[in-house]
Swiss-Prot record:
Entry EC number(s): 3.6.1.5
EC top class named in words: hydrolase
Signal peptide, first to last residue: 1-21
Keyword field: ATP-binding, Calcium, Glycoprotein, Hemostasis impairing toxin, Hydrolase, Metal-binding, Nucleotide-binding, Platelet aggregation inhibiting toxin, Secreted, Signal, Toxin
Catalytic activities: a ribonucleoside 5'-triphosphate + 2 H2O = a ribonucleoside 5'-phosphate + 2 phosphate + 2 H(+)
GO MF, one annotated term: toxin activity
GO biological process: proteoglycan biosynthetic process
Compartment(s): Secreted
The name this protein goes by in its record: Apyrase
Lineage of origin: Eukaryota, Metazoa, Ecdysozoa, Arthropoda, Hexapoda
């Protein structure tokens, strides 16, 4: 009996030791990023063609550790639609009603990106209140309920004549039929500035998502400062904070992201919640435009501000949208 007990005890101890020593299983996430090439979007082969680039990557997770790899291939996508000689400056990636969309921040066009790499115009967003001749500077997009929400930077600025431009304070609600409702978010943007103790400063938004699981807004600002917006200095300013807000922005929390960013001038351009993380873990793009040069970084953080993967360089071009893909099979495969 004693011998049997020893054998069982040894087996249990061995099992425990093997479990503790065994490597955690790996989880793989496929994702794609899309570029805003600014003036480089004009095709060198055809002045009437404008291009963007989509790249595919893979994020690997083992426990709370992350790393990633990017495919070498550039998937070029083209459109002839432009505004004042600028086009395909695509600033976000979003799945809505099982289709993939992207947003031109010059023309205001919402494009559907098909698997064969065609960019198909779906909706044109007019600037500001929706009754203007120029396009909306779309910078972020998310889904909430049955609607797509599209927003801009959330800042006001004065032009060379001193006239105040507040078009970026508006957001667009779009239903599945393409009907657009324009809403002024000045009150919400001002509340966020107050919550961050920046009432006279500015917060530049490009990365906003609605969390269905937590019933709250999550925002990762691109830039933030206690000082008023200044075009002479904004290139040197980033932001290393998370904003969490209730549905109607009655309750707002500002969270510092722990650690030091690779470059203080880099700020968030897009993020998505990782599946099965209960909207607790975020994969995010950070971009920088400084002294005529650009770069894109990838990072992983949690909702408390803990950095799970520090900023890592992705590309020297500026990629402003990220989307998670269930599969990349057949993705952006042009028909021969």
């Amino acid at each position: 009996m004693f011998l049997k007990f020893c054998v069982v005890a040894f087996a249990i101890c061995l099992s425990i030791n093997l479990s503790e020593g065994a490597p955690s299983s790996e989880t793989i996430y496929k994702f794609a990023i899309i570029a805003d090439l600014d003036r480089k979007s004009i095709s060198q082969k055809n002045d009437n063609n404008y291009k963007s680039i989509v790249k595919i990557g893979q994020l690997n997770q083992v426990g709370r550790k992350f790393n990633f790899a990017m495919e070498n291939k550039d998937h070029e996508i083209f459109t002839k639609y432009a505004y004042k000689g600028r086009g395909a400056e695509l600033s976000e990636f979003l799945v809505y009603k099982w289709k993939l969309y992207t947003f031109d921040d010059k023309s205001g066009i919402v494009f559907k990106l098909k698997n064969n790499a065609d960019l198909v115009p779906w909706v044109i967003l007019a600037n500001g209140n929706g009754d203007q001749v120029d396009g909306f500077k779309a910078e972020w997009a998310t889904t909430k309920g049955d609607k797509m929400y599209v927003g801009s930077t959330g800042i006001s600025w004065s032009d060379s004549t001193g006239k105040l431009n507040s078009n970026s304070l508006w957001i667009k609600e779009i239903n599945q039929d393409g009907k657009v409702l324009s809403s002024n978010w000045k009150e919400y943007y001002d509340k966020m500035k107050s919550a961050m103790n920046m009432p006279k400063g500015f917060i530049w938004h490009e990365a906003v998502n609605w969390s269905k699981k937590k019933n709250q807004w999550v925002l990762l600002p691109r830039k933030c400062s206690e000082l008023p917006f200044d075009t002479e200095t904004e290139e040197t300013i980033g932001c290393n904070k998370i904003i969490i807000a209730s549905e109607n922005f009655q309750k707002i929390n500002s969270i510092d992201i722990k650690g030091t960013p690779f470059d203080p001038a880099a700020g968030f351009s897009s993020f998505k919640f990782l599946p099965d993380s209960d909207d607790q873990i975020l994969i995010a793009l950070k971009t920088i435009e400084k002294n005529g040069k650009t770069a894109t970084y990838l990072t992983v953080i949690d909702i408390t501000g803990k950095v799970l993967m520090s900023d890592k360089i992705v590309n020297k071009d500026k990629f402003e949208g990220i989307v998670l893909l269930k599969s990349t099979e057949g993705f952006l495969k042009r028909k021969e």
